[in-house]
Amino acid sequence: MPRTISLAVVPGDGIGPEVVHEALRVLREAVPADVSLDTTQYPFGAGHFLETGEILTDSDLAALAQHDAILLGAVGGDPRDARLAGGIIERGLLLKLRFAFDHYINLRPTTLLPGVTSPLASPGEVDFVVVREGTEGPYAGNGGVLRRGTEHEIATEVSVNTAHGVERTVRFAFDLASKRERKRVTLVHKTNVLTFAGSLWQRTVDRVAAEHPDVAVDYLHVDATMIFLVTDPSRFDVIVSDNLFGDIITDLAAAISGGIGLAASGNVNPTGAFPSMFEPVHGSAPDIAGQQKADPTAAILSVSLLLDHLGLPEAAARVTAAVSADLAARAAGDPAPRSTAEVGDAVIRALSTNH
């Protein structure tokens, strides 16, 4: 039955438009013949803010909410620009979208793809997914300052953990693990020190685990997790954690699997009540913008996550396979740098070959 995907596209700043352009080319090539793509571009980002004074208005949110999904490039301007200080774009755009659209799952697959060199001497088979809670923890904005600027200043940042928020995240992790070959969930926290929040997470995992007898479960403190990520990353299958620990884990996970230049992510609302957003993890790199130097691989892998989320797993697998083939060919062939468009061309050729 014919289907149309309504996609909001936010190219953003710096290299964002270049990598998104290639990601869209791959997406159009990957979707099945009975699926059409209807894209609407939005100008949000640092450049838009500097021109208009607006970051993301209520009417912007209402427009974005009408789409099936969002593809984001990268946002952020010149870090030396005082008008952009304090993470104003990241908070006003990315975090605002996350909370407004209840993106309570931050999904970060970590795979050491063929031809990619890990900084680890013997990484083994690296293939795991981090399920990070996305709307609570210390990022919820529950905190404040008293006596600012004095020697008696008090700053608080409260980590918010609700039974509802923890359970829906844990259930997502177990559902995901049950579909994977190794079927294993690792809870990462610091229950020996953060006893109140840690207890809530552990009790929730224990309760949900009882409903999934086919899924193995273990627990690691976050500091031990950091050690195992660099000494034995192949032990992990699905990691579930809170917002702060998940944020830290995912960056190290990207580093051991080739760097953030290859890392894709999904900010997901699994209920479908709002569109989920998919993006490369890397920044806007304004120093190389417009020079065709940026590698669009992470943006293309974000398209794979997008397709899988929209119920097109075969198309998603084809995109990942095409990226894997291109990375392997790069490692075996000419090491000379390729332009952004040339990488897109190569992935599309690989897609066509594996159709």
From Swiss-Prot:
One of its GO terms (cellular component) is cytoplasm. NAD(+) binds at G283, S284, A285, P286, D287, I288, A289, G290, Q291, Q292, K293, A294, D295. InterPro entries: ICDH/IPMDH (IPR050501), IsoCit/isopropylmalate_DH_CS (IPR019818), IsoPropMal-DH-like_dom (IPR024084), LeuB_actb (IPR023698). It holds the Pfam family Iso_dh. It catalyses: (2R,3S)-3-isopropylmalate + NAD(+) = 4-methyl-2-oxopentanoate + CO2 + NADH. It comes from the Bacteria. It is found in: Cytoplasm. Its EC number is 1.1.1.85. Mg(2+) binds at D223, D247, D251. It is an enzyme of class 1 (oxidoreductase). PROSITE patterns: IDH_IMDH. Catalyzes the oxidation of 3-carboxy-2-hydroxy-4-methylpentanoate (3-isopropylmalate) to 3-carboxy-4-methyl-2-oxopentanoate. The product decarboxylates to 4-methyl-2 oxopentanoate. HAMAP family: LeuB_type2. This is 3-isopropylmalate dehydrogenase. It comes from Clavibacter michiganensis subsp. michiganensis (strain NCPPB 382).
